[in-house]
From Swiss-Prot:
Family assignment from sequence similarity: Belongs to the frog skin active peptide (FSAP) family. Brevinin subfamily.
Record localization: Secreted
Superkingdom of origin organism: Eukaryota
Keywords in alphabetical order: Amphibian defense peptide, Antibiotic, Antimicrobial, Cytolysis, Disulfide bond, Fungicide, Hemolysis, Secreted
Protein name: Brevinin-1BYb
Expression by tissue: Expressed by the skin glands.
UniProt record, GO biological process: defense response to bacterium; defense response to fungus; killing of cells of another organism
Disulphide-bridged cysteine pairs: 18-24
GO cellular component: extracellular region
Role: Antibacterial activity against Gram-positive bacterium S.aureus and Gram-negative bacterium E.coli. Has moderate antifungal activity against C.albicans and strong hemolytic activity.
Coiled-coil annotated spans: none
InterPro entries documented for this protein: Antimicrobial_frog_1 (IPR012520)
Length: 24
């Protein structure tokens, strides 16, 4: 479960960071 969650976080993290901080 955790490895899957970690991989999802690695994929979605940059996109969420981009949306939240407006630094794309």
């Amino acid at each position: 479960f955790l490895p899957i969650l970690a991989s999802l976080a690695a994929k979605l993290g940059p996109k969420l960071f981009c949306l939240v901080t407006k630094k794309c």
